[in-house]
Amino acid sequence: MDNKIVGILGGGQLGRMIVEAANRLNIKTVVLDVPNSPAKQINSNEHVDGSFTDLKSIIQLAEKCDILTVEIEHVDVEALKYVKEKFGVEIYPLPDTIKLIQDKYLQKEHLIQHGISVTESVAVPSNDEQSLIEIGNKFNYPFMLKSRTLAYDGRGNYVVKTKESIPEALEFLKDRPLYAEKWCPFNKELAVMVVRSIEGEVFAYPTVETIHKNNICHVVYAPARVSDSIAVKASVLAKNAVKSFPGCGIFGVEMFLLPNNEILINEIAPRPHNSGHYTIDACVTSQFEAHVRAVVGLPMPKNFTSLSTTTTNAIMLNVLGDEESNKELEICRRALETPNASVYLYGKSTRPNRKMGHINIVSSSMEDCESRLDYIIGKSSKIPENLIPKEKPLVSIIMGSDSDLPVMSVGANILKRFGVPFELTIVSAHRTPHRMTQYAIEAPKRGLKVIIAGAGGAAHLPGMVAAMTPLPVIGVPVKGSTLDGVDSLHSIVQMPRGIPVATVAINNSTNAALLAVRILGAYDYKWLNEMNQYMNNMENEVLAKAERLEEVGYEKY
C-alpha cells in the first residue's frame, strides 16, 4: 500500500493493534520497546530493543524508519526533536503536541486559551502542606490532586478529602510536579475519538460512555446512553479541542457530563485510546487503522468513522488481571461461547488490575449487548439468544392537544394496518414551544422519516415544525368548534415559500398516513409493495361492489 516504514515508540497493546492495522495495509512497522513486548510478538520485522525514553534507542529506531508515531505519550520529546532534525524523519503527532499533552496542567491551559471548556484547575507552586491548604481554601474539600506528568489509568491521582489528608496526599505523590482540580461532580463520563489529518481536517467517532472501576476504564457503551443533542455537543467539543493541536493522528478525548448538561474536557491522549477499542468491530474503520491512515497520509473516505450501520450498538469490556493468576481467562472463555462477542488478548503475563485484553460485543440493540455482557461477566447463567430489537419509529404523529386524538388516531390505525413503526405524542406549538423545537430538530437523528402534525384553530404546529426540520411534514387541519376547521386548513396550507407542508383535507388523518407510507415507499420497496397491495385491494373492493350492483340492481343493492 505504501513503501514508508512506520516506527512505533511503545510496544504495548495499543502498539500491537496499530501493527495489526498496518499489516492489513501492507505497511511495514518497527517497534521500540523491551524484547517480546505485545506489539513485537505479532510482527517478525527487525525491531529495536530499548526504551522510548532513551535517546540512543530512539536514534536506532529513526535510522530504520520514515515516520515515527507513539502508542504512549510518555516518551523523550527532546530526543524526537533531535532525530527529526538529524534524519528528516516525519513524526506524528508532532513532538511539540506530545510535549504539551504530556503535562496535563499545560494541556488544560492550552485548551483554555483556545476557548475549550475544561475542569477548573490550578498549578501547585510547591509540594508542601501550606500550598495545598491554600488550594483547599480556594476549592473547598474534597479536591483532586494530580501529577502533571507520567500519570496513567488513575496512577498519579489522589482525592484530598479533608485538610487532615494533605500529608498523606503529599507522601503518595511525592517528587512529582503537581496540579489540583476543583471537585467536579458529574453524571456520566463521555469520550470521543477524533482523527486529525495532516491538512488539519478532523473526523469524530461516535460519542461513547465510559464506566471506570478503580480509576481504570471498565466498560464502554457505544453509542453513549445520552440524548442526541448531548452526543453532538460532546463531539463538537472534542473536535474543537483536537483542532487546536498541530500535526496528525488519532486523539482520545475524555469528558465529564455535568448535571446541568454542561460538558467539560477532562484530558486528552495523543494516541489510540481504550475508549476506542469498540471501533474494531463496530465501525467502518477502526481507530488503529484511522491512526495509520492519518500518519502515512492515506485517504480518509466519507463516513469512515461512523458505526457500521444505523442500528449498530456495542459494548467494550476490559479484561483485567485477577488476584488469582489467569482467572480472568474465565471471562474470555464465556465470551468465546457468546454470539456476537470478540475476544482480544494482548500477550501479557498476568498481574492484578493489568490490562490483559478486551472483549467487544456488537448487536442491533443495546439491550441485546447488555444481555450478552451479563452472561460474560457471570451475572446470568444462560447464553443469550438473539433478541428481536425494537423497531425504531419511522413516522411521528404529533398533535397540539389530546382533544385532537380522535382525529389523529384514525391515521395511527392506518399506519398500524401497514405495519409501519410509529410514535404518537402531544407537542403544542404554543404551550410547549421548547419541546416542539427540540422535537423537530432531533427527529432526523432519531431515524424518523416523516412527521404528521395535526392542529386546530390557529394551527401553527405543522408549519413551525416544518421550519425546523428537513423531514417532510404532513399537516392535518382539525375541525374546531367555531369555523369548522376552515381556519386550520387556511393556516396550514398558506405556508410561505421555502417552508413546504403537505396539507390534507380537514380531519383526514387517513390520507396523511397513506401519504406517509408513499413517502417511505420512495426509498424502501417494502412500503411501495404494501401500498401497491392496498391500492389493489381498494380496486377489488370497488369492482366487487360494481359487479353486485349490476347483478342485483339498485333497488335491491
Swiss-Prot record:
Keywords: ATP-binding, Decarboxylase, Lyase, Nucleotide-binding, Purine biosynthesis. It comes from the Eukaryota. Its EC number is 4.1.1.21. GO terms for molecular function: ATP binding; metal ion binding; phosphoribosylaminoimidazole carboxylase activity. The keyword Nucleotide-binding applies. SMART domains: AIRC. One of its GO terms (biological process) is 'de novo' IMP biosynthetic process. It catalyses: 5-amino-1-(5-phospho-D-ribosyl)imidazole-4-carboxylate + H(+) = 5-amino-1-(5-phospho-beta-D-ribosyl)imidazole + CO2. The keyword NAD does not apply. Pfam families: AIRC, ATP-grasp, PurK_C, RS_preATP-grasp-like. Residues 108-296 form the ATP-grasp domain. In the C-terminal section; belongs to the AIR carboxylase family. Class I subfamily. This is Phosphoribosylaminoimidazole carboxylase. The gene is ADE2.
